[in-house]
Design a protein with these regions (language model features):
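Class I S-adenosyl-L-methionine
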Residues: 1-110
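Class I SAM-dependent methyltransferase SAM-binding "motif I" and its flanking Rossmann-like core
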Residues: 13, 87-158
């Protein structure tokens, strides 16, 4: 079966990337990435077929990764932090659903160290109580939903 990895590269550079993510990158023929992440991981992706694009082209990158996989090329789409937390996983799953590709492509999502947890660790601020992570980006989320999420989290006294 054709394979598409959604690879978390951690909170930046090579310091937070998991061995499992490195193995997936090594196994992949094609790497799809935001240009900045590709530069940060240069030595790891050297010699691979590479598709990069700039900020705000997330949907196009996801569509291209799926297309490479459909062509039979083992593909890894990279995202910093954890792909499942404000990462590329949601977009990939939505596109896979839209095109009903679940019987055609094996999708493997690899978790990583979120930027939130890396920052908390560096600050010496362990997260030991209930907490909420609310993205303030209105790029793919309506600002009214962001406002509502913040209000509900504060009503519950979550650490934000």
């Amino acid at each position: 079966m054709k394979r598409l990895y959604i690879v978390s590269t951690g909170a930046g550079g090579l310091g937070y990337i998991s061995p499992e993510a490195i193995n997936a990158i090594n196994e992949s023929e094609v790497i799809v990435s935001y240009s900045k992440y590709a530069r940060e991981l240069g030595s790891l992706i050297k010699g691979k077929e590479l598709f990069t694009s700039g900020m705000t082209h997330e949907i196009a990158r996801c569509a291209q990764a799926i297309e490479y996989a459909r062509q039979g090329k083992t593909t890894a789409i990279l995202s910093n932090g954890d792909v499942n937390v404000y990462g590329m996983a949601t977009l990939i799953v939505e596109l896979m659903d839209e095109k009903d590709l679940w019987d055609e492509i094996e999708l493997i999502s690899l978790p990583g160290v979120t930027s939130f947890l890396a920052a908390a660790s560096k600050a010496g601020a362990p997260v030991s109580q209930d907490f909420a992570i609310v993205s303030l980006s209105d790029r793919l989320t309506d600002i009214n939903l962001i406002d509502k999420s913040i209000k509900f989290a504060l009503d519950c006294e979550f650490v934000l």
